[in-house]
Amino acid sequence: MIEHIFIFNNSTSLSNPVFDISEVAVGQHLYWQIGDYQLHGQVLITSWIVLGGVIIFTLLANSDLKPLPVGLQNFTELVTEFIRDLAKTQIGEEEYLKWVPFLGTIFIFVFVSNWAGALLPWRLIELPNGELAAPTNDINTTVSLALLTSVSYFYAGIRKKGLGYFKRYIQPVVFLLPLNVLEDFSKPLSLSFRLFGNILADELIVGVLVALVPLFVPIPLMLLGVFTSAIQALVFATLAGAYIGESIEDHH
């Protein structure tokens, strides 16, 4: 993995033998040693911050529920309605309600994680090694979310169809079995690398531009990063719902 990206300051002259170099670190981690295992400490720290923020916001918004929602309660109900519509569209009217909590958790965690990476000045917090960033900036987080999605759509299909779920691998013809199996293995890969790649690329571009021109030039890209972060959360949740809906639909 790339460890360092060196950027020559634009104010240097080729005639000057001493070059000012800015550095953007990639792939460095703060490790916590637990027995024989190493954990990525900065990912756990930012994940706990995101989860804590979501839990506190939810408790504040819904601690005093009213028949006519106002303020934060109104906002949380709008988010819930949006997630219900997404689940209904992707999974279908018969099964969607039981999957609203799962898709809602996925969407909100990815959305808040992405925005935390785009909006919060994580780099102001110094660590012994590595630096804080969005949880979704780490491949371990995105792979975990993708594998959780894979387990969910296998569970949904087997729960509804039993072992008959695996008939889908030989439909419409038997010789498509390898391709159908490969498709199921490629789904978590595409989910995880799409999210990881977009978030990492956005943070790298902003980091490089801030190192080169630290004032106003990076602002438009930072705003674009906020927009794409929201889109990536929507894409991840939509595809998760689509995979679950595909696993429980009847094949004729």
Curated annotation (Swiss-Prot):
Entry annotated with the keyword Iron: no
> One Pfam family for this entry, by name?
ATP-synt_A
**Main subcellular location:** plastid
User: Which terms are listed as keywords in the entry?
Assistant: ATP synthesis, CF(0), Chloroplast, Hydrogen ion transport, Ion transport, Membrane, Plastid, Thylakoid, Transmembrane, Transmembrane helix, Transport
Its record classes its membrane topology as:
Multi-pass membrane protein
Q: Where in the cell is it found?
A: Plastid, Chloroplast thylakoid membrane
Q: Which PROSITE patterns does the record cross-reference, listed alphabetically? A: ATPASE_A (PS00449)
Molecular function terms from GO? proton-transporting ATP synthase activity, rotational mechanism
Task: Give the signal peptide as a residue range, or say none if absent.
Answer: none
TM ranges: 41-61, 100-120, 138-158, 204-224, 225-245
List, alphabetically, the InterPro entries matched.
ATP_syn_F0_a_bact/chloroplast, ATP_synth_F0_asu, ATP_synth_F0_asu_AS, F0_ATP_A_sf
**Which cellular component, as a GO term, is one annotated location?**
proton-transporting ATP synthase complex
Q: Which family does it belong to?
A: Belongs to the ATPase A chain family.
The UniProt subunit note reads as follows:
F-type ATPases have 2 components, CF(1) - the catalytic core - and CF(0) - the membrane proton channel. CF(1) has five subunits: alpha(3), beta(3), gamma(1), delta(1), epsilon(1). CF(0) has four main subunits: a, b, b' and c.
**Functional description taken from the UniProt entry:** Key component of the proton channel; it plays a direct role in the translocation of protons across the membrane.
User: Could you tell me what this protein is called?
Assistant: ATP synthase subunit a, chloroplastic
User: Which organism was this protein described from?
Assistant: Oedogonium cardiacum (Filamentous green alga)
